[in-house]
Amino acid sequence: MKLALIDGEHYPDVNRWAIEKIKPCCAVFVGGTEKIGSIRDIEKALNIKVYHSPNIFEALSKAISENNITEVIDLSDEPVLTPNLRFRIASYLLKLGITYKGADFEFRAKEWKKIDIPSISIIGTGKRVGKTAIGGFVGRTLKELYKVVIVTMGRGGPEKPEVIRGDLMEITPEFLLKVSEEGKHAASDHFEDALTAGVITVGCRRCGGGLAGFSFFDIIDEGIEIAKSLNPDIIVFEGSGPTFPNVLADGFITITSAIHGTEKIEQYFGPLRIGLADIVVVTMADSVSEEKLKRITQAIREINPEADIHLTRFVPRLIGEVDGKAIIATTNPQSAKKFSEELEKMGIEVVYYTGNLAKRNILKDELAKVNYDDTAIVELKAGAVDVVIRHAFSRGKRVVFLDNEPKNIDGKDLKEAVINLARRIVNDKGN
């Protein structure tokens, strides 16, 4: 059934004229009183039930809960509904799988899929927010309690779902170089998660991403079936950039970077990603001011008051031993500098650092000019395998992988929060 959004900037007879054309079962009054007397006057004029509340979303929630709404038609306009508020409404409706349609726009959610195995979805408000680092953290946290399978969907993922037994094999630089030489993207997320979490991963691919975060093409359905066949206690889905699987998981962890501020949270379809969250992880919180962190926290709470917010920073976690002088390569110049300083405090002599893993040509030029004695320390991202590892091996150097470990700066415990979320989900499903 259809629901109409109406306002008091239109005369009641104009609203009635439009309502008769679209024939909704009910309406939500979204504000504006310039051309009306009272809500009762509108109800009499329209002859349908009109829901209203000072909070638009409370009125929408009540209308949707009492009616089988599949489509919301927006008959309002500015100044009552601003573009930002319309995106908030769209985010709210797409979360519920309801189409939102206006005079010159239509937002239609991909069908949300449900699975019978307990699941958590890790999604991001954008690229380079630390989503895969959190994915690995969640995987290695939960493997202490459950059999975990992580399902990824990357732009460099395989054409057919690929299983990596991170629980049984060691992900070595030599192995990844061989994978790269076979023409595969050896730094794809399912390899990184297998490396950092030590769990089974299923790599999938996707192409294209819509405004709300749904992909144009993906093979996630095939990936789900393979994941289920591995008999996990819990499946962890991991998005790609701002795009994520259209799986209505039992729990959501949304990742946003403090460096991005509130824009990715409040604007466009940021409210959808925040609104889905049980836990919101704010990464790189040590890189911004206290005032900016307060604004970020307030923005999250305004959209999702129930979300458990964690302010975190990343610290380097080495997967292997480092001896002698080393270089470090990451995808971010700021993190490269910061990590080099932290590794120096650990007794490692860093002779060069670069944040150009995602810029292969620049990276190659840098490495050609650098002399180092022993080890290349590298994140498993972008050009890590086909540039850094290949270069290091050609010079007889060792490679040690670098992981980004989240640490709370707010006195809270992200590990405990992840465990509690998983326990609730598993218990609710009776596993």
Swiss-Prot record:
Record field: catalytic activity: (2R)-2,3-bisphosphoglycerate + ATP + H(+) = cyclic (2R)-2,3-bisphosphoglycerate + ADP + phosphate
Enzyme Commission designation: 6.5.1.9
Subcellular location: Cytoplasm
One GO BP: gluconeogenesis
InterPro entries with a match to the protein in the record: Cyc_diphosphoglycerate_synth, P-loop_NTPase
GO molecular function: ATP binding; cyclic 2,3-diphosphoglycerate synthetase activity; ligase activity
Entry annotated with the keyword ATP-binding: yes
Any one of the GO CC terms: cytoplasm
The keyword Cytoplasm belongs to this UniProt entry's keyword annotation: yes
Keywords: ATP-binding, Cytoplasm, Ligase, Nucleotide-binding
Free-text function comment from the UniProt entry: Catalyzes the formation of cyclic 2,3-diphosphoglycerate (cDPG) by formation of an intramolecular phosphoanhydride bond at the expense of ATP.
Family of this protein: Belongs to the cyclic 2,3-diphosphoglycerate synthetase family.
Protein's name in the database: Cyclic 2,3-diphosphoglycerate synthetase
The species this protein was found in: Pyrococcus furiosus (strain ATCC 43587 / DSM 3638 / JCM 8422 / Vc1)
Gene name for this UniProt entry: cpgS
